[in-house]
Regions:
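Beta1/beta-strand and adjacent pyrophosphate-binding region of the FAD-binding site
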Residues: 4-19, 38
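Short beta-strand/turn micro-motifs composed of small residues
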Residues: 15, 41, 95
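Dinucleotide-binding Rossmann-like beta1-alpha1 core, especially the glycine-rich loop
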Residues: 54-136, 142-143
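Short, hydrophobic alpha-helix immediately C-terminal to the catalytic nucleophile
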Residues: 21-25, 161
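Glycine-rich FAD pyrophosphate-binding loop
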Residues: 28-50
């Protein structure tokens, strides 16, 4: 369905994926009048990268600024799991020795901002840890595990369509 666009808007957001719709949602707290916020989307909500890659909710990033942003984002997902179609099951990064130093750095940075996670080191300890979760675990060569206690996954396409539907009056195209 082709909608007519307003001739002016206070805010124009390009893209109706997770970033665009989340931005529109937050800005709708400030801009209350219909048409003040316009979201332009060339295809459909969650049709691009957001519909493919944004279902995993985690805080496993190398950049400290991104880690702080994602810690905040995880708290938003946790604020209403039912509405967001969010499943708080945690997140595991299971790594070989070549990644040990980087994963250890992520763990230290998570601890520094109070993000709950556990770091397991050594092949034997990693094997025991994973067998405690999956009794039939068999993978070899794992020397570190970063277990984020928060995080999980969301049914992102359903969630984004619901977010679009629940936004205050604005143009979403």
């Amino acid at each position: 369905m082709i909608m007519s666009l307003p001739t002016k808007a206070k805010v124009v957001i390009i893209g109706g994926g997770i970033h665009g719709l989340s931005t529109a949602w937050k800005l709708s707290e400030t801009y209350k009048n219909p048409g003040e916020i316009v979201v332009l989307e060339k295809k459909d909500t969650a049709a691009g990268a957001s519909g493919i890659a944004c279902g995993v909710v985690r805080n496993n990033y190398f950049q400290p600024a991104m880690r702080e942003l994602m810690a905040h984002s995880v708290s938003v997902w946790e604020s209403d799991p039912k509405a967001f179609k969010y499943n708080p099951v945690g997140y595991l990064q299971i790594s070989p020795e070549v990644m040990h130093e980087d994963v250890a750095s992520i763990y230290k940075q998570q601890k520094a901002i109070g993000y709950e996670s556990e770091f397991i080191e050594g092949e034997k300890d990693c094997m025991n840890y994973m067998k405690g979760i999956f009794d039939d675990w068999q993978a070899q060569g794992i020397t570190s595990i970063l277990h984020e206690k928060k995080g999980g996954y969301a049914l992102i396409k359903i969630q984004l369509k619901r977010l679009k539907k629940n936004l205050p009056p604005m143009v979403v195209r």
